[in-house]
Amino acid sequence: MRISTQMMYEQNMSGITNSQAEWMKLGEQMSTGKRVTNPSDDPIAASQAVVLSQAQAQNSQYALARTFATQKVSLEESVLSQVTTAIQTAQEKIVYAGNGTLSDDDRASLATDLQGIRDQLMNLANSTDGNGRYIFAGYKTEAAPFDQATGGYHGGEKSVTQQVDSARTMVIGHTGAQIFNSITSNAVPEPDGSDSEKNLFVMLDTAIAALKTPVEGNNVEKEKAAAAIDKTNRGLKNSLNNVLTVRAELGTQLSELSTLDSLGSDRALGQKLQMSNLVDVDWNSVISSYVMQQAALQASYKTFTDMQGMSLFQLNR
């Protein structure tokens, strides 16, 4: 079978074109660091990379959610730390108010002190975050949850929750009712078996009103005032216990968020390595292949050039 000069030319050109395409592809891989830039480069790896990319995006979203949750929980804990101090100060005032030898002026002075503590607690209960949203209003964050005059709660009834991992949703914002209008199951009961007061502001209002009432020379009013002070004292114990219970929960959540962050970081690192194995170049392999392909291409160029200069007259010399 005769092979024409044209056929030899076309075969050599085809070989050169293919070698050049492969060499340029290897060069592109070296410049980008990616072995797979198009699905056709490795359909299986490309498909797995798409799925893995979605998992990476989800992991990043949960990381952002945990950052937001940590900020919310930390802010609530900071405010409740101040609430704890204020309640403890109020308890000290109430214990002192139980002294039966106080004059009406002394009692009035204590009432003023308690009113200041109540105002402080009201401001804390109506605290806002950096965006002006009320942190103890549940999902009704645009309006103050507590009424300044009555201490009544008008915020949302549902706690704010946030999904912080694929299988974990947690409370990141308690309602004001859960903190300032609630007591625990082991609360100190009333001696007569009646329901214990739950509203912190009502407790303080009861004591303030009793301390403002003159009792000197009036045993009936003195007994009423003493009963009111005792009731407030029990109420403050219950309220403080409730706040401390919520704070313990917040501490547990902050610890869990930290653990989830560590797991998320480990997961992100594993996903990054897996993605690299799927689409990134093996530098030793690609550099070696690039050099070999370059040498082969140069040899093909030389062969083609030599063939172009060949003729029967040159062969017979």
Curated annotation (Swiss-Prot):
Location(s) in or outside the cell: Secreted; Bacterial flagellum
Disulfide bridge partners, by residue number: none
* Gene Ontology annotations of biological process type: bacterial-type flagellum-dependent cell motility
Write one Gene Ontology MF term. structural molecule activity
Q: What is its main location?
A: secreted
List the GO terms this entry assigns under cellular component, sorted alphabetically: bacterial-type flagellum hook; extracellular region
In terms of InterPro entries, this protein maps to: Flagell_FlgL, Flagellin, Flagellin_N
Record's keyword terms, sorted:
Bacterial flagellum, Secreted
Family stated for the protein in its record:
Belongs to the bacterial flagellin family.
Q: What is this protein called?
A: Flagellar hook-associated protein 3
* Biological source species: Salmonella typhimurium (strain LT2 / SGSC1412 / ATCC 700720)
Q: What is the lineage of its organism?
A: Bacteria, Pseudomonadati, Pseudomonadota, Gammaproteobacteria, Enterobacterales
